[in-house]
Amino acid sequence: MSAYALSQSHRQLTEGHLKDTDPEVDQIIKDEIDRQQHSIVLIASENFTTTAVFDALGTPMCNKYSEGYPGARYYGGNEHIDRMELLCQERALKAFGLTPDKWGVNVQTLSGSPANLQVYQAIMKPHERLMGLDLPHGGHLSHGYQTDSRKISAVSTYFETMPYRVDLETGLIDYDMLEKTAVLYRPKVLVAGTSAYCRLIDYKRMREIADKVGAYLVVDMAHISGLIAAGVIPSPFEYADIVTTTTHKSLRGPRGAMIFFRRGVRSVNPKTGQEILYDLENPINFSVFPGHQGGPHNHTIAALATALKQANTPEFKEYQEQVLKNAKALESEFTKKGYKLVSDGTDSHMVLVSLKDKQIDGARVETVCEKINIALNKNSIPGDKSALVPGGVRIGAPAMTTRGLGEEDFKKIVSYIDFAVNYAKEVQSQLPKDANKLKDFKNAVSGDSEKLKAVRDEIYQWAGSFPLAV
């Protein structure tokens, strides 16, 4: 038997646990666990993943490089990596009720925004046209956001983008105006997806509009993929050409993404009867690798496979049903307290609260909430001019539902947020006119007032009483 060639201290370095080899990093992680354990987490795009997913995520699967796809790698030693990726793909299709003759899926893409860019690059040439929901109206940066003076998303620099919007009176997508604009603009891609739109999308209508202008219909279901997998809201797969999703929001997996693409017949030539087949699989796979990425994160794919298995259980359906109930509890309680909700409510996992009638903005309310251990986010609402000081807050149910909270608990959460709104208004009203900017407000609440401390201590104890998988 050969002797270990390096020093014993080197061996201890490679085999020692984090708490022994890097206590500084270990302490920061412990502090973050404590924050999660004792906070009310309402970020709509966050969730608490499961112990089994953590188990898969922290494995030597991360050691392996595997550029390419199963059966066609650029490195050796990938037999088990291939098995894992194929299993993950199989479970992804099963989770959404799909069959491999009609759908394929790429599970290598690293996150949601890159997944969308990879899709666009696969099916569009530079400067071809795309339409997506405007960011202040509930869309996402990766759907091509730009302002009057500046291209914000890289998507808007590579492609020509035109937003569609909601009706300012109803807060609902204006499909009639979308259709008129699409007919004039003739986009190559129509994106149906949101980050702060609380109502269901009419995928059938979107399909009809896409067909009318000869566009691909790309659905970004990042926020709602868990709800779709559980069958508690309608699925886009009947109508979409391509579907993208992150894996860590309502799906409750590791941080990652997937791209689903159609296989088979796309259309039939009405004159010749000739079938026109989809040509999406190879362009999308090539766009992911080698187009935009190198080797995939195999530990993430393993953890995603585990999350997808969990998504195909009765317990996951029970969870998603409770998410919807808790979101409805938020809707009813905010309405009861006199708050205006964008679109007057929700059909999904979150509510978007307008604060304009309260004479306060989302940035200030977010600041106070953070002081009392509530994590939510300021959010643009239709008609806003600034994304930094927007007129609303976005509040999601998935994370705290994972920890076991029910409708009465979410009603209690509304009372805490109502306290934060009133406290923010009180502080803002006391600021002098020449020093009432957001930075002045933050300075004013930076101290430890007795009122804030009492509420924070109450929330710390209450939130900490619910289980958290770590």
Swiss-Prot record:
Its cofactor is pyridoxal 5'-phosphate. Keywords: Acetylation, Cytoplasm, One-carbon metabolism, Pyridoxal phosphate, Transferase. Residues 12-23 have a biased composition (Basic and acidic residues). Its main location: cytoplasm. One of its GO terms (biological process) is tetrahydrofolate metabolic process. The modification N6-(pyridoxal phosphate)lysine is found at K249. InterPro entries: PyrdxlP-dep_Trfase, PyrdxlP-dep_Trfase_major, PyrdxlP-dep_Trfase_small, Ser_HO-MeTrfase, Ser_HO-MeTrfase-like, Ser_HO-MeTrfase_PLP_BS, SHMT-like_dom. Residues 1-11 have a biased composition (Polar residues). It is found in: Cytoplasm. Homotetramer. Belongs to the SHMT family. Interconversion of serine and glycine. NCBIfam families: PRK00011.1 (NF000586). This is Serine hydroxymethyltransferase, cytosolic. It comes from Candida albicans (strain SC5314 / ATCC MYA-2876) (Yeast). The gene is SHM2.
